[in-house]
């Protein structure tokens, strides 16, 4: 045993020098001293797989991950939770090989072993559901529109599981509750935006067992369905913030304003106006109401329901060499007009300028609020330089 441990430690310490060879030598030594299924081997196979993966030797990496997982199963059982890092690594590797169905099988296996350990609706399922949602969202851009839609369908089913667990097992005063509900709301925008850009495939070809399918809704109701689901999640954010012991009026006002943003993006202008007015009024009990209102609502703000940011994140004020500076007027409905380029690293063609203006008009901004009511206002922002096509 001491020899095996020494080999493992030695392999780990010199892995950075020549990782693949060193891992293979350590594996050979442990197999010779102990057995082909010695538990000390599993970590070495995981390290070997990661080294091969970093070299883009994906088929060899997959074999290493599968071997490590097999050793875990022999030692700890077919449903052991120790398989988790191997299953995630296999899913990553299969995705790079273009085997998306195999990636999904590995992730379904990860979900299954956790449900067997905890139960499908146990709060301890949240970390693995987070991991699955992160995976499907991070690989979305690597897929075709139809493949990306498949990722989003699965992501929504994962989110439905998370929502059920949150409602049942996570009290609203839990510190994680606001961010968790917020992320579920943002996902609905992501899905609705994909459908707006690419349409909805008639057949996604999915058979994931995480939740049952209730059938495909008609195109006329799809947008409203995602609007409603996102609205419910963002309302839960507000409820959770009210229950937080350290929540401030500013936190609550920002969450209410974000609900107003949600209404505005989905064309519910009257409801957006009501939400913005409420957010403005909530600040009345702060130490310095006018200062808070000025800081939060005196200028337009681009509405972004991004899965990769917190609600407090704003556009950087620091321009880079590849960014343009734009000026515009933001209407009371959050639409950009009179869009002009005020500073550019290089001149734009008429076609590039036309596309830029079209893109900006498709975005929505939280309008400036004056006494709680939307008002037209000038706005400036940075914009990524269009990439020239050669």
Task: Explain the meaning of each model-derived region.
Residues 1-51, 55:
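N-terminal leader/linker segments that initiate helical-solenoid repeat arrays
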Residues 7, 12-13, 35-39, 92, ...:
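Charge-biased low-complexity segments
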Residues 20, 27, 34, 41, ...:
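Heptad-repeat amphipathic alpha-helical coiled-coil interaction surface used
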Residues 20, 24-27, 62, 69, ...:
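Tetratricopeptide repeat
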Residues 43, 85, 124-127, 179, ...:
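Residue register of alpha-helical TPR repeats
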Residues 59-140:
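A generic tandem-repeat structural signature
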């Amino acid at each position: 045993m001491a020899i095996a441990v020494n080999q493992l430690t030695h392999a780990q310490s010199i892995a950075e020098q020549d990782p693949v060879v060193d891992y293979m030598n350590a594996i050979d030594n442990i197999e010779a001293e102990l057995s082909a299924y010695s538990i000390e081997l599993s970590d070495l196979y995981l390290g070997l797989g990661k080294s091969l993966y970093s070299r883009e030797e994906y088929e060899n990496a997959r074999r290493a991950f599968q071997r490590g997982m097999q050793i875990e199963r022999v030692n700890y059982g077919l449903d052991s939770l120790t398989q988790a890092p191997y299953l995630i690594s296999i899913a990553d590797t299969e995705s790079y090989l273009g085997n998306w169905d195999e990636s999904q099988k590995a992730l379904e296996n990860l979900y299954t072993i956790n449900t067997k350990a905890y139960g499908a609706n146990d709060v301890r399922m949240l970390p693995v559901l987070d991991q699955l949602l992160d995976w499907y969202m991070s690989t979305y851009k690597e897929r075709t529109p139809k493949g990306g839609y498949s990722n989003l369908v699965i992501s929504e089913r994962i989110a439905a599981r998370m929502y059920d667990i949150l409602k049942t097992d996570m009290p609203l005063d839990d510190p994680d509750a606001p961010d968790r509900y917020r992320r579920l709301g943002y996902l609905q925008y992501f899905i609705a935006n994909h459908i707006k850009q690419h349409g909805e495939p008639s057949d996604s070809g999915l058979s994931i067992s995480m939740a049952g399918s209730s059938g495909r809704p008609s195109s006329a109701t799809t947008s409203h369905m995602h609007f409603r689901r996102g609205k419910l999640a963002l309302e839960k954010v507000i409820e959770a913030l009210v229950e937080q012991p350290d929540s401030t009026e500013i936190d609550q006002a920002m969450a209410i304003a974000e609900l107003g943003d949600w209404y505005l993006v989905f064309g519910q202008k009257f409801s957006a106006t009501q939400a913005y007015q409420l957010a403005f009024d909530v600040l009345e009990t702060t130490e310095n109401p006018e200062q808070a209102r000025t800081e939060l609502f005196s200028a337009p703000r681009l509405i972004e329901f991004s899965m990769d940011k917190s609600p407090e994140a704003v556009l950087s004020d620091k321009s880079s060499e590849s960014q343009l500076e734009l000026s515009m007027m933001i209407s009371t409905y959050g639409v950009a007009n009179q869009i002009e380029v005020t500073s550019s690293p290089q001149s734009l063609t008429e076609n590039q300028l036309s596309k830029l203006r079209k893109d900006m008009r498709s975005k929505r901004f939280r309008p400036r609020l004056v006494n709680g009511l939307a008002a037209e206002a000038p706005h400036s922002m940075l914009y990524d330089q269009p990439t020239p096509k050669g």
